[in-house]
C-alpha cells in the first residue's frame, strides 16, 4: 500500500520552521562534540531546509511496536512513582486505620508504635523536614552530588521518603547519624507521651549505632544506601516490635541492619521499567525512497599554516543541496507518543525480506522473467553501503584563480564534514536509536 504525503503542509508554516530550527540546532550541537582534525578550527551549522520534493513511502507491514519503545524514561518513572507513592500512602492510611488518629488511642499505645501515623496531630515537625504531600514531587528532590552525603542517587532511599520526609542533602546530618531528628539538642517539649517514649528508646539503642555509618575513608566512593535508612525517624522503632500491617512492599527495617547498595559493584543493574501494552498500540514499517533537495548550510574554518602554524583561519562555506536515501522506516504510536527511526539494512532484511526476495516474489506474481542476479547483487551491495547513498554538496571559499580554488585542503574538509553528517544521521536515527514525539 502506498500513501501520499502532503510535504508542504508538514514542512511549511510556523510548525515546519520550528522543526527545521530544532534539527539545525541539533546538528550544530553534535558538531561541537566532534573531534576536529588539525586543519579545521570549528564547524558551524547555519540553516536547514526540507526542500520541496517529498519522499516516496510504501507501507510494508502493520505489527506490534518494538519492546524498546515501551521502556520508561527516568523522569517518567520518578514522576509516576512520586505521585503513586504520596497518594497511595495517604489514602491507605485513612482507609485502613481511621481509628488510629484518635487522641485516646495514641495516649494508650505509647509502647506499641507499629501502626502509628508518622505525623499525628500536634506533632511539631522539624523545619528542615518536609511533611507528606506535594513536596514528594521529584523536581523538589535534588540528588546529592557531594561524596559522603547520605542519600546519593540511589532509588532505595526514595521509597522511604513516604514515612521519613526528604533524604540526601535536605535531611540534617545529625538526624542521619543518630537516627533521631532531635539528636542534636533539639527540644522535645512539644512532643506527646508517645513521642517521648519513642525518643527514649532511640537513646537506649544508641549503643547499637556506636560505629560510624558514613565511610569517610574514600571520599570519592559512592555512599551506601544504608545511610539513608536512619533518616526516617520512626523506621527502627515502628518495625522493631512487630511488622506493620497493611500493604507494604518493603520488609521491616531494624536498627543496625546493613542494607546492600543495589547498584554497588558486583550487582546486576535492575531491568528497565516497561509501560503496559495496550490494544490500540501499533507500528508501521514502510519503505522510504528519497531523492530530494533538502538543504543544509555549514561553515568550516580552515587553518593556514603559512608563514607559521595556524597563522589565520579562512571560512569555508558548504551547502548540502540534496541527498539520496533508500531504507525502511519504523513509526510506532504508543499512548500519545510517536516513536520514529530507521532500520539498518540487516534488520530491514530480517523483518521484511531482502530486496532480491521482493523482486523475485513480485516477478513470480506478475509472471514476468526474474531479474538477473548481477543487478540484484549490485542493488543489495549498494543498499548495504549505507542508508544515505549520496550527499550532494557545493563549496565556496575566498577568491578563485583561473576557475580553481587556491586552497588544497578543501576536498579534505568536504569529505570530513560529509562523513560527520552521515555518522550523525546513522547514530541518531538508526535503530536502536529513535526519536520520540509527543502528540
Swiss-Prot record:
Record key words, sorted: Endoplasmic reticulum, Lipid transport, Lipid-binding, Membrane, Mitochondrion, Mitochondrion outer membrane, Transport
Domain SMP-LTD intervals: 1-439
Span of the signal peptide: none
Composition bias type Low complexity, residue spans: 231-240
Region of interest (Disordered), ranges: 70-102, 184-274, 353-386
PROSITE patterns: SMP
BP-aspect Gene Ontology terms: mitochondrial genome maintenance; mitochondrion-endoplasmic reticulum membrane tethering; phospholipid transport; protein insertion into mitochondrial outer membrane
Subunit structure: Component of the ER-mitochondria encounter structure (ERMES) or MDM complex, composed of mmm1, mdm10, mdm12 and mdm34. A mmm1 homodimer associates with one molecule of mdm12 on each side in a pairwise head-to-tail manner, and the SMP-LTD domains of mmm1 and mdm12 generate a continuous hydrophobic tunnel for phospholipid trafficking.
Name of this protein: Mitochondrial distribution and morphology protein 12
Species whose genome carries this gene: Neosartorya fischeri (strain ATCC 1020 / DSM 3700 / CBS 544.65 / FGSC A1164 / JCM 1740 / NRRL 181 / WB 181) (Aspergillus fischerianus)
Amino acid at each position: 500500500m502506498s500513501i501520499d504525503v502532503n510535504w508542504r503542509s508538514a514542512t511549511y508554516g510556523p510548525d515546519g520552521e520550528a522543526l527545521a530550527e530544532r534539527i539545525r540546532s541539533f546538528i550544530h550541537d553534535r558538531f561541537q562534540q566532534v573531534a576536529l582534525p588539525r586543519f579545521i578550527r570549528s564547524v558551524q551549522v547555519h540553516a536547514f531546509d526540507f526542500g520541496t520534493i517529498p519522499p516516496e513511502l510504501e507501507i510494508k507491514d502493520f505489527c506490534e511496536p518494538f519492546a524498546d519503545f515501551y521502556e520508561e524514561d527516568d523522569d517518567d518513572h520518578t514522576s509516576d512513582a512520586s505521585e503513586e507513592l504520596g497518594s497511595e500512602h495517604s489514602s491507605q492510611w485513612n482507609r485502613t486505620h481511621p481509628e488510629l488518629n484518635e487522641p485516646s488511642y495514641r495516649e494508650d499505645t505509647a509502647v506499641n508504635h507499629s501502626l502509628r501515623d508518622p505525623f499525628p496531630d500536634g506533632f511539631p515537625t522539624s523545619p528542615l523536614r518536609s511533611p507528606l504531600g506535594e513536596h514528594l514531587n521529584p523536581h523538589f528532590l535534588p540528588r546529592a552530588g557531594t561524596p559522603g552525603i547520605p542519600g546519593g542517587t540511589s532509588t532505595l532511599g526514595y521509597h522511604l521518603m513516604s514515612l521519613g520526609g526528604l533524604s540526601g542533602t535536605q535531611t540534617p546530618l545529625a538526624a542521619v547519624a543518630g537516627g533521631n531528628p532531635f539528636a542534636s539538642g533539639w527540644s522535645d517539649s512539644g512532643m506527646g507521651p508517645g513521642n517521648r517514649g519513642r525518643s527514649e528508646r532511640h537513646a537506649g539503642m544508641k549503643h547499637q549505632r556506636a560505629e560510624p555509618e558514613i565511610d569517610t575513608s574514600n571520599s570519592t566512593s559512592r555512599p551506601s544506601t544504608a545511610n539513608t535508612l536512619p533518616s526516617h525517624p520512626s523506621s527502627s522503632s515502628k518495625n522493631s516490635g512487630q511488622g506493620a500491617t497493611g500493604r507494604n512492599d518493603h520488609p521491616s527495617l531494624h536498627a543496625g541492619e546493613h542494607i546492600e547498595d543495589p547498584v554497588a559493584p558486583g550487582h546486576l543493574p535492575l531491568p528497565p521499567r516497561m509501560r503496559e501494552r495496550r490494544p490500540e498500540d501499533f507500528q508501521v514499517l514502510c519503505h522510504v525512497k528519497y531523492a530530494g533537495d533538502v538543504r543544509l548550510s555549514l561553515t568550516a574554518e580552515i587553518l593556514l599554516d603559512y608563514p607559521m602554524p595556524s597563522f589565520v583561519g579562512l571560512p569555508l562555506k558548504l551547502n548540502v543541496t540534496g541527498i539520496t536515501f533508500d531504507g525502511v522506516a519504523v513509526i510506532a504510536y504508543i499512548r500519545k507518543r510517536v516513536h520514529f527511526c530507521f532500520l539498518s539494512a540487516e534488520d530491514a532484511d530480517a523483518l521484511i525480506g531482502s530486496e532480491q526476495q521482493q523482486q523475485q516474489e513480485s516477478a513470480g506474481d506478475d509472471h514476468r522473467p526474474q531479474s538477473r542476479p548481477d543487478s540484484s547483487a549490485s542493488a543489495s551491495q549498494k543498499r548495504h553501503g549505507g542508508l544515505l547513498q549520496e550527499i550532494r554538496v557545493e563549496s565556496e571559499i575566498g577568491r578563485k584563480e583561473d576557475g580553481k580554488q587556491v586552497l588544497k585542503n578543501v576536498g579534505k574538509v568536504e569529505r570530513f564534514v560529509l562523513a560527520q553528517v552521515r555518522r550523525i544521521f546513522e547514530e541518531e536515527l538508526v535503530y536502536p536509536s529513535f526519536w520520540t514525539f509527543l502528540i
